[in-house]
From Swiss-Prot:
Entry function: Suppress platelet aggregation induced by ADP, collagen, thrombin, and epinephrine (IC(50)=170-330 nM). Also dose-dependently inhibits the adhesion of human melanoma cells to fibrinogen but not to fibronectin.
Subcellular localization(s) per the UniProt record: Secreted
Protein name as it appears in the record: Disintegrin ussuristatin-2
Misc. remarks from the entry: The disintegrin belongs to the dimeric disintegrin subfamily.
Subunit structure, interactors included: Homodimer.
PANTHER family: ADAM A DISINTEGRIN AND METALLOPROTEASE DOMAIN (PTHR11905), DISINTEGRIN AND METALLOPROTEINASE DOMAIN-CONTAINING PROTEIN 28 (PTHR11905:SF32)
Chief site of localization: secreted
Pfam families referenced in this protein's UniProt entry, alphabetically: Disintegrin
């Protein structure tokens, strides 16, 4: 939702302040295939295995989302 940095529905998430829906100090992310322990995983980490004609999808190191790298 607008103004939220993370999903504050789960107070157990150590990366997200459930009261404010903002990332805790020092956290880069709260969830995602490229987020681990509140930090973006390093560039080149495979986040989705190759399928058919598609190549492995790899994290960018700049986002918690796993991008579609394509062919």
């Amino acid at each position: 939702e607008a103004g939220e940095e993370c999903d504050c529905g789960a107070p157990a998430n150590p990366c997200c302040d459930a009261a404010t829906c903002k990332l805790r100090p020092g956290a880069q992310c709260a969830e995602g295939d490229c987020c681990e322990q509140c930090r973006f995983v390093k560039e080149g980490t495979v986040c989705r295995e190759a399928k058919g004609d598609w190549n492995d999808d790899s994290c960018t190191g700049q986002s918690a989302d796993c991008p579609r790298n394509g062919f």
